[in-house]
Structures are given as C-alpha cells and as structure tokens.
Design a protein with these regions (language model features):
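Catalytic/RNA-binding core of pseudouridine synthases
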Residues: 1-149
Length: 149
C-alpha cells in the first residue's frame, strides 16, 4: 500500500509498554510517511486508540477539539506506589475501608466532567522547561508542578 505522500487522520491502537512516540515512529517507518504526529500522549503503561495525523494534516491538530475523551480503568485497592500506578513497587496498606474508598472514588469521578484544572503527578509525561516530569522524579529533583486545564 502506497501511503507516503498521503495526508490523513488514522485511529491507531497503542499497546501497553509502547510510548505514543513509539507508535508514531513505527507507523512512519512502516508506510514511509514524511511526517507523523499524535494529538495527545498516553502513558507507556496505558493502551488504547490514538488519533494520528500524517504529513500536512499534522498541522490541523491545533483546530481539533481535544476535550471530549472517555477513559476506562481498573483500580487496585489496598496498595500504594511511588508512581501512583503499577510501574513501581506496590506496597500493601495495612487496612482499608473499601466502602469509604468507593465513595471517595465516586465523588472524585463525578467531578471530572467539563473543563477542569489539574495538577499532574510528578510521574507524568507533562513537560516543564522542556523536560518530562517523570525525568525530574527519577533524578529526585524538585520542580513546581503546573496547573493545567
């Protein structure tokens, strides 16, 4: 299939353990595109569909409403980790009131609609001064976390 000169949008599945850039690089090399970009970043441990643009269409991302997203997740109660996910060692919490945790989760999720302000976790791909936050975290360097819409 000859696609290298085509400008278009694609929905591609990003598997667990790949970075968003890994997916773009693979797609670009496989079909010999001049330029490939993505509309947002998924964590390496996340999997799902990503909107990918090729060639001239990469410039159109500025005009795409990127606010309507749906997330599915699985939660593991009774553990905590330095990275707030399963990428670092899980430490079991002595005791947990599952009913109150489910109520907390319900309250938290109900507030995640519309335009919201968030402070990203230190282990995230958000950039501060051109550097990903997780790199500051791995180097144990303090950095001010940005508030984002």
């Amino acid at each position: 299939m000859k696609l290298e000169n085509q400008s278009d949008f694609y929905l591609l599945y990003k598997p667990n353990s790949w970075t968003s850039q890994d997916l773009c690089t693979f797609f670009k090399k496989k079909y010999k595109f001049q330029k490939v970009g993505h509309s947002g970043t998924l964590d390496p441990s996340a999997e799902g569909l990503m909107l990918i643009a090729t060639n001239k269409y990469t410039k159109l991302f500025d005009y795409i409403d990127n606010t309507h997203k749906t997330y599915e997740f699985e939660a593991l109660f009774g553990f905590e980790s330095a990275t707030n996910d399963t990428d670092s060692e899980l430490v079991e919490i002595e005791s947990i009131n599952l009913e109150s945790k489910l109520e907390e989760l319900d309250k938290g999720i109900s507030g995640l609609t519309g335009n919201i302000k968030q402070v990203p976790p230190i282990y995230s791909a958000v950039k501060v001064k051109g550097k990903r936050l997780y790199k500051y975290a791995r180097q144990e360097k303090e950095v001010e976390l940005p508030i984002r819409d």
